[in-house]
Amino acid sequence: MSTIKEYLSELSGRRVTVIGMGVSNIPLIKLLLRAGVEVTVRDRSSRERLAGQAQELESLGARLILGEDYLKDLPEELIFRTPGLRPDNPELLDAVQRGAALSSEMEVFFQTCPGRLIGVTGSDGKTTTTTIIAEFLKEAGKNVYVGGNIGRPLLADVADMVEEDY
């Protein structure tokens, strides 16, 4: 495990692309840009649909590739894919064959989170179970961060987390 600062330092000078401008990838994109990483953001949506979000990321230094051909020619060395894009996508497989590495916002979080992680999986009851676990831990005086499909993307908070956190 490395700290988020160490992880970002390792990306210095590398060409990175983030596929998808959804809720979970926006904190990743901003974190990379603030660290001085050269970031290309790719999304199937049009500029009109992304409006202010596209402008904000460009003002922070991101290069945007939008529209139907957003996955054409992936020359970057590291590709962060959105959870909605299958890892066996032909364009991704081509990029990997050329030497690109695949990652995700959650993978970065798992690699850099100093706290204790609790995963909840299953078909039904995940939100309820997660909420109950969080409340039990809070009642015990623990500092708790809740992520996944409830709460907010945790990568934005990882720099503030310590080993005792959940």
Regions found by a protein language model. Give the residues of each.
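Phosphate-binding loop of NTP-binding sites
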Residues: 72-74, 83-166
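N-terminal leader/targeting and accessory segments in enzymes
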Residues: 1-104, 108
